[in-house]
Amino acid sequence: MITLSNKKNKLNEHKNSLCVTYPRTVNIIFGHYPYPEVIHSFLLEIKNNIDPEMENYTHVKGGMTNWHYFLKNDLFTNFMTYIINKHQTSHPDIFEYFLEKRTIREAWGNEVKSGDHLNPHIHNHIHGILYLTEGCDLILPDLNISITPHPGDYYM
């Protein structure tokens, strides 16, 4: 049995990641953003800013904001700050000096209604998703896993 001697140490925070190899290797960093009022604000931002020209434009066949809608948005900035602070000790290769080493090129929101769907696709770079509502499972067939998300859950 291992006991942590300094329980107030910042390194003792609960962090989650899963490394999956089937047939490729992917490290999935995940957690829960514990601010329901912010999740609700994200929902309203998306609902009120759907761009009709972006509908069905990506693999998500539903409503979408502009590709860059959230880049300068305080809700998104605060969410990213939370993610960086939460995971920089467990994943320094990604999150240490994140804002100095990396550029977030796009940050948008999707609205998926009944009858909308998602086409299978793959991401080759770091990407993430913050779930704002209950929905269907996130199925990753190339990793042979299925994820059941809840509002506030994020995956990178």
Task: State each model region's role.
Residues 97-156:
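Catalytic core of non-heme Fe(II) oxygenases with the double-stranded beta-helix
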Residues 2-99:
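Non-heme Fe(II)/2-oxoglutarate
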